[in-house]
């Protein structure tokens, strides 16, 4: 059995990714923002089971190709099973991205909810840039956790009783200092891309707003409720003592840890399949163009 964590999270990935984007918005980005009008070769870093390939290939110009890289053997096997039934030119490679160089032959390098798990995201961005040809693009779909947490509304209660934004921000910052991993990396990517030499850097935000509507059809409501719970909204916290000890070890004071536990417990108790809830994931979508570098002899001709 694989020891790689994400090999055991395939169902979670399949059940929650659809919460983030409407298909027409991705089509708008491809056609109107990035202006992709001819076939492109895409490489995705940390591709999982190829979700972004599944979303982008149908709306990219015919003849586009997709290469997915991930160190999860089970994830890559699952991706191969899915894409074997589809008409797209795709390739999946099992590889540890942090240690493997890739040839500079792609038009676009992308990541989706990947850089937040890296202890040195800037190093990975450099590798992404190095795999893209001149005038190609780097596109990063990455989370901004504090914006995510402030973009859900549970009807009938005070939001500050279930979402302690100040404590969460402190917790996220302490985690970054301790591990190097940053769930707020999405808001920082435009700065990093520009500092690394990309031009025409821009950033958009994911469009989808999920509405748990008590007047919607029962099947759709059940599907959405289960996805929201699996995404982490209103999940029941573990044993109080264990949670408190974990929060204390991550840098919170005893008072802050107590408030955070009580907020999570309250959210879990209040959020049911009979709740009215609105949730916008608020993913940041950052992009920039790789500089075209001509050799000296070419410039002189």
Placement of each model-derived feature along the sequence:
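Class I SAM-dependent methyltransferase Rossmann-like catalytic core
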Residues: 1-24
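C-terminal helical/coil "lid" or tail adjacent to the Rossmann-like core of SAM-dependent
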Residues: 2-5, 202-275
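A short SAM/SAH-binding and catalytic strip from SAM-dependent methyltransferases
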Residues: 107-122
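A short glycine-rich, Lys/Arg-flanked "PGG" loop and its adjoining helix->strand segment in the class I
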Residues: 123-137
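Conserved catalytic/acceptor-binding region of the Class I
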Residues: 144-230
């Amino acid at each position: 059995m694989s020891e790689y964590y994400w090999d055991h999270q395939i169902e979670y990935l399949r059940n929650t990714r659809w919460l983030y984007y409407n298909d027409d918005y991705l089509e708008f980005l491809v056609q109107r923002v990035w202006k992709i009008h001819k076939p492109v070769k895409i490489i995705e870093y940390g591709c999982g089971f190829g979700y972004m390939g599944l979303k982008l290939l149908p709306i990219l110009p015919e003849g586009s190709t997709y290469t997915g890289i991930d160190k999860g053997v089970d994830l890559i096997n699952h991706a191969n099973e899915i894409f074997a039934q589809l008409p797209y030119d795709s390739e999946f490679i099992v590889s540890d991205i942090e240690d493997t160089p890739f040839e500079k032959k792609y038009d676009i390098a992308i990541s989706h909810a990947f850089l937040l798990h890296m202890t040195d995201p800037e190093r990975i961005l450099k590798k992404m840039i190095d795999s893209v040809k001149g005038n190609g693009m780097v596109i990063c779909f990455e989370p901004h956790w504090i914006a995510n947490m402030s973009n859900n509304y549970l009807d009938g209660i005070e939001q500050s009783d279930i979402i302690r934004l100040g404590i969460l921000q402190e917790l996220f910052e302490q985690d970054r200092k301790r591990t190097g991993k940053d769930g707020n990396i999405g808001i920082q990517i435009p700065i990093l891309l520009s500092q690394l030499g990309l031009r025409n850097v821009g950033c958009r935000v994911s469009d989808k707003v999920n509405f748990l509507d008590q007047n919607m059809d029962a099947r759709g409501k059940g599907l959405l409720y289960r996805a929201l719970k699996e995404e982490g909204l209103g999940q029941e916290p573990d044993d109080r003592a264990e949670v408190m000890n974990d929060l204390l070890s991550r840098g919170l004071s005893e008072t802050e840890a107590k408030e955070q536990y009580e907020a999570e417990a309250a959210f879990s108790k209040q959020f049911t399949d009979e709740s009215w809830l609105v949730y916008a994931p608020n993913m940041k979508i950052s992009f920039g163009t790789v500089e075209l570098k001509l050799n000296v002899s070419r410039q002189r001709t």
